[in-house]
Structures are given as C-alpha cells and as structure tokens.
Amino acid sequence: MKKQPIVLLLGKLPPPFMGPAIATEILLRSALRDRFRLVHLDTRAHRSLTSMGNWSIRKAFRTLSIYLRMKWLLLRHRPDVVIIPISQSTLGFFKDSLYLWIAKAFFRKVIFHLRGSNFRTWYAASGTINKAYVRWVLRRIQGVIVQGEKLRPIFEGLV
C-alpha cells in the first residue's frame, strides 16, 4: 500500500462558529482524509467573538504557543506540505507569514489558502514596503488555493 502524503493544515476551529473555523472543520472531515494524512494545527488565539481584534498579553502568549506547537508538529510528523490560510490585512498577513518562515526553516513545501476575495484590493492599497514584503513572501510558496476559478486572477503576477 502506498504511503499517504502528510498535510499539515493550519486553521481555526469553532468556537466561535464563523466562516473560516467552519471551513477548516469541513476540510478536516472531507474526503481529503482518504488521500492524505491530515494533521491539524488550531491557530485560534481567541475563545470568543468579543475577544477578536483585541490585543492582550494572554493572546500574545497563545499565539507564541501556536508557533511553538507548529515546530513540534513539523518535527513529529514531517509533513510533505503545509497549508496556511492567509489574511487580507497587513497585520494579519504578517502574522500568517510567520507560519511560512517556520515551515521553510524545516524545508517544507507551503501552499497558501485564501478564504475571501479582497486580497488584491488590499495589496493594491498597500504601501511600497508592504507590497515588497508580500511579493517576497509569495515567491517562497508553491501555490495558492482560492475558492473558485474566478478568483484565480487575484494572484496574477504575484505567484
């Protein structure tokens, strides 16, 4: 029997029940399990909708612990590919790009997963330094998953 490729899938899980968390849950329960060995890293740093978007020491430590857990999962499972959902805001993209750098430190292939359609608009409105960083990051990934064919042009000229 052929060994299943190992995929480290990053993403939030409910609660709170919201689009990205539900999408991650659906992926983890999908037929992908028949073709890949899915390993999941819950990237949720908040426990409720009221704490979303608010900074706290507790959330900073939780985020740091998520990065450390990712390192442990990379060492333990040695995934063939890491799938990272990306944000469409400057701070969110920077935070998400740290997952890329951790994966690349372990010589893993990385695929970004965009859940939304605002990336190109955000990128176009970004400053020169931010655009340069985004291009630098996107040159280091193996691809991007979007939610439909019509969204593929979002990354035209970037990936």
Question: Which role does the model predict for each range below?
Answer:
Residues 1-47, 107:
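N-terminal subdomain of nucleotide-sugar transferases
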